[in-house]
């Protein structure tokens, strides 16, 4: 049986990402080695996620809290990668996503440093996030971290650790079209709007330094972060990791899985409509003249 081209694409394009973000190499090889059809991707990863979830829950019962946090975080990551581009079956995708959130919530108090779930008011609803503060810091600077097209806050632990180890707090947030927000709020090119809501919320905290707020984004988040920073004057530094300068310009070169994921998460009916919608995701124009922050690309 020939392997589904979508499975081949997922493996060839995203293997380094999965492994560098915390998927064990043995798990990656065993899980992907048995998947022939894309329709089986989500279920296969959920099965392996359940193994780590079981180990985490058993560790909690036995009082091994650090081990529990590690296993439950890994379970959340695997459930996330089960659903990350599985937009062809929304029911399966949402079920896996719910498990990712559940496992991460269980893990947060047992991480070092521990984390807390936060809900940031936005457009009559909220944006969900995870806040972690380095040990021993009264009011550390804070880095707001923005996921990409098919990523979410449950994937971001490997990215946040360098900031935590250097004395910075981290706030991982699902923006519109991402993670918990993707079902209610579509992707939006004017990310300065949700960014303003996030910064407004940060300013209510007394346990971080609100004069030193950074904004970090990866992949599509590497577009969203500098776009927002060009407008949001309360942000003092920005890191853009591999973001597109103009999303519509790269549309035709994206894998089919990515185009379909963008369609679903922008709440468009067709890919033709989604391509037109993607024109809003651009750094062209006068944005450079608006920015007062320090950038790192």
Task: Label every PLM stretch briefly.
Residues 145-158, 170:
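Serine-hydrolase catalytic-loop signature spanning alpha/beta hydrolases and amidase-signature enzymes
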Residues 163-180:
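Conserved alpha/beta-hydrolase
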Residues 43-52, 93-138:
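N-terminal cap/lid segment of alpha/beta-hydrolase-fold proteins
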Residues 155, 162, 185-211, 227:
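Alpha/beta-hydrolase active-site loop
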Residues 230-297:
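Hydrolase active-site cap/lid region
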Residues 1-41, 133:
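Long, non-catalytic architectural segments outside compact domain cores
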Residues 80, 200-257:
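Primarily recognizes the serine-hydrolase "nucleophile elbow" in alpha/beta-hydrolase
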Residues 133, 139-148:
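Short beta-strand element of the alpha/beta-hydrolase
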């Amino acid at each position: 049986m020939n392997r589904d081209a979508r499975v081949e694409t997922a493996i060839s394009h995203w293997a380094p990402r999965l492994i560098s973000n915390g998927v064990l190499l043995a798990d990656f090889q065993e899980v992907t080695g048995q998947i022939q059809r894309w329709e089986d991707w989500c279920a296969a990863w959920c099965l392996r996620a359940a193994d780590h979830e079981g180990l985490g829950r058993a560790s909690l019962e036995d009082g091994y809290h650090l081990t529990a946090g590690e296993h439950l975080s890994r379970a959340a990551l695997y459930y996330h990668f089960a659903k990350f581009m599985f937009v062809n079956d929304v029911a399966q995708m949402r079920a896996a996503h719910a498990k990712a959130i559940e496992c991460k919530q269980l893990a947060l108090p047992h991480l070092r440093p521990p984390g807390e779930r936060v809900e940031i008011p936005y457009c009559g609803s909220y944006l969900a996030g995870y806040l972690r503060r380095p040990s021993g810091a009264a009011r550390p600077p804070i880095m707001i971290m923005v996921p990409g097209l098919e990523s979410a806050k449950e994937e971001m632990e490997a990215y946040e650790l360098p900031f935590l180890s250097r004395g910075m707090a981290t706030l991982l947030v699902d923006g519109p079209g991402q993670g918990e927000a993707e079902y209610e709020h579509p992707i939006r090119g004017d990310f300065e709007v949700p960014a303003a809501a996030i910064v407004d919320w940060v300013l209510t905290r007394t346990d971080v330094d609100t004069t030193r707020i950074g904004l970090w984004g990866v992949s599509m988040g590497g577009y969203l972060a500098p776009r927002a920073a060009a407008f949001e004057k309360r942000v003092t530094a920005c890191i853009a990791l591999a973001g597109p300068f103009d999303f519509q310009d790269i549309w035709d070169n994206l894998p089919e899985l990515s185009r379909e994921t963008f369609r679903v998460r922008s709440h468009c009916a067709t890919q033709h409509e989604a391509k037109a919608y993607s024109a809003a995701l651009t750094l062209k124009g006068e944005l450079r003249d608006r920015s007062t922050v320090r950038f790192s690309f």
